[in-house]
């Protein structure tokens, strides 16, 4: 990642700290991956604090594929199988079957309905019967170990929301340009400025976690 593009958002460590602080304050964060990977920016939010207004923003400016990042334990609690048994996608993105809240939604498409589905899925006492399948929310399985295991937006989302003190459940959606093309770093930075979001890279988060976990182990 071209670090000069991100200099206004601080050093790599500061960018992670700012992202954690933003999530704690109920704001969203823009997460960039490597230019040699997907080269995309995702809007991410803590699932516990996401508002209808933030969901509407996500749908309006994103790809439309609103994903709920969860760990293996939660997926087992909800009895959500993987979408396919043989995952041949380029980066092994862990899609499960899609979901809809069993109660409290209409078509499931609106910002309110999608947020209702997310809240049903992350409730402490959530059961498989609380969700219908298929639906309009796309759960993603995060790998154990987070970004130190897999450098994806899914793992970055769960790492950031847990570092911020929330349960391991985060919402992500890829940012798109007005013409429907994928937003890359320059467009992500403009969007972040407009919507008061910090920008952090997955590389930043990997370095942050390694440095702290090395200190804790010493």
UniProtKB/Swiss-Prot annotation:
Which PANTHER family does the entry link to?
A: 3,4-DIHYDROXY-2-BUTANONE 4-PHOSPHATE SYNTHASE (PTHR21327:SF38), GTP CYCLOHYDROLASE II-RELATED (PTHR21327)
The name under which this protein is listed is: 3,4-dihydroxy-2-butanone 4-phosphate synthase
Q: Which cofactor does it need?
A: Mg(2+); Mn(2+)
User: Which residues bind D-ribulose 5-phosphate per the record?
Assistant: 37-38, 42, 150-154, 174
What subunit structure does UniProt give? Homodimer.
Per the entry, what this protein does is:
Catalyzes the conversion of D-ribulose 5-phosphate to formate and 3,4-dihydroxy-2-butanone 4-phosphate.
Q: Name one GO cellular component term.
A: cytosol
């Amino acid at each position: 990642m071209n670090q000069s593009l991100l200099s206004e958002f601080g050093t790599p460590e500061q960018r992670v700290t700012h992202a954690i602080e933003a999530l704690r304050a109920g704001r969203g964060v823009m997460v960039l991956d490597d230019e040699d990977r997907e080269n995309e920016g995702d809007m991410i939010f803590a699932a516990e604090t996401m508002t209808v207004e933030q969901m509407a923003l996500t749908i309006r400016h994103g790809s439309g594929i609103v994903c709920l990042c969860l760990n293996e334990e939660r997926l087992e609690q909800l009895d959500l199988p993987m979408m396919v048994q043989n995952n041949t996608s380029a980066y092994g993105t862990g899609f499960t079957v899609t979901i809809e809240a069993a109660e409290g939604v209409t078509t499931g498409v609106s910002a309110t309905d999608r947020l209702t589905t997310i809240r049903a899925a992350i409730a402490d006492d959530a059961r498989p019967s609380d969700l219908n399948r298929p639906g309009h929310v796309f759960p993603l399985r995060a790998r154990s170990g987070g970004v130190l295991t897999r450098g994806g937006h899914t793992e970055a989302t769960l790492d950031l929301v847990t570092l911020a003190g929330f349960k391991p459940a985060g919402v992500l959606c890829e940012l798109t340009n007005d013409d429907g093309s994928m937003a890359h770093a320059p467009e992500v930075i403009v969007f972040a400025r407009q919507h008061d979001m910090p920008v952090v890279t997955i590389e930043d988060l990997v370095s942050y976690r390694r440095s702290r976990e090395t200190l804790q182990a010493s």
